[in-house]
Amino acid sequence: MKHIADLRKSYESGELDEAFAADTPLLQFDTWLQQALSAGLPEPNAMTVATVSADGRPSTRVVLIKGYDSRGIVWYTNYKSRKGQELAGNPFAALQFHWVTQERVVRIEGRVEKTSAEESDAYYDSRPLDSRLGAWASPQSQPIGSRAVLVANAARTAAQYGLHPPRPPHWGGYRLVPDRWEFWQGRKSRLHDRLVYRLVDGTWLRERLAP
């Protein structure tokens, strides 16, 4: 059996040079995300969300980005979940995208706010029926006796609302408003490229970090 400490990889897929990087992090992110989508990478929209509890204990989970623009990065979830509870007490979070094939990582930090009810309603209504029922069926992050509990909850919701279940009041969107972005491109000899964008007095400042 190969020892995990002996696993090696040479990073040679690309480079990240200031001369060709975008002036704003949102444009740089859009460029990389569109390239990941065009390359057919598996779930290029998957991102890790890191939150911290009131007593300083961090936790992470993978969710799917559902929108991004000049206001921030959007995803949807159960507000009563662990991440929801932690964001209620500490509204700062970090996101990470890892596109393995392209040897790229994007890290984003900032303050998190809820999306408007109108935004949450619009996205919820666009989801498949099973997903809308699932938002009612799952008491996310809470212990349950068995999977049968979820199935029964979904069936009960379907019987009550039919084809048009409303959005649960405990389910909706979050938007991370970035104040820091970092773009990492793997390079040969572990001399990786790292560019960071920091928001200072309303202006994005870009600088290179040592790998």
Swiss-Prot record:
Oligomeric and partner information: Homodimer.
Pfam families noted in UniProt: PNP_phzG_C, PNPOx_N
Catalytic reaction annotation: pyridoxamine 5'-phosphate + O2 + H2O = pyridoxal 5'-phosphate + H2O2 + NH4(+); pyridoxine 5'-phosphate + O2 = pyridoxal 5'-phosphate + H2O2
Obligatory cofactor(s): FMN
GO terms of biological process kind: pyridoxine biosynthetic process
Entry GO MF terms: FMN binding; pyridoxamine phosphate oxidase activity
Enzyme class: oxidoreductase
Family: Belongs to the pyridoxamine 5'-phosphate oxidase family.
Protein name: Pyridoxine/pyridoxamine 5'-phosphate oxidase
Key words of the record: Flavoprotein, FMN, Oxidoreductase, Pyridoxine biosynthesis
Binding sites annotated in the UniProt record for substrate: 8-11, 66, 123, 127, 131, 190-192
Function recorded in the entry: Catalyzes the oxidation of either pyridoxine 5'-phosphate (PNP) or pyridoxamine 5'-phosphate (PMP) into pyridoxal 5'-phosphate (PLP).
Top-rank lineage group of the source organism: Bacteria
Residues annotated to bind FMN: 61-66, 76-77, 82-83, 140-141, 184, 194
Signal peptide coordinates: none
EC number, UniProt record: 1.4.3.5
Residue ranges that the Swiss-Prot or TrEMBL entry lists as coiled coil: none
PANTHER family documented for this protein: PYRIDOXINE-5'-PHOSPHATE OXIDASE (PTHR10851:SF0), PYRIDOXINE-5-PHOSPHATE OXIDASE (PTHR10851)
Cofactor, free-text remark: Binds 1 FMN per subunit.
Pathway of action: Cofactor metabolism; pyridoxal 5'-phosphate salvage; pyridoxal 5'-phosphate from pyridoxamine 5'-phosphate: step 1/1; Cofactor metabolism; pyridoxal 5'-phosphate salvage; pyridoxal 5'-phosphate from pyridoxine 5'-phosphate: step 1/1
NCBIfam families: pdxH (TIGR00558), PRK05679.1 (NF004231)
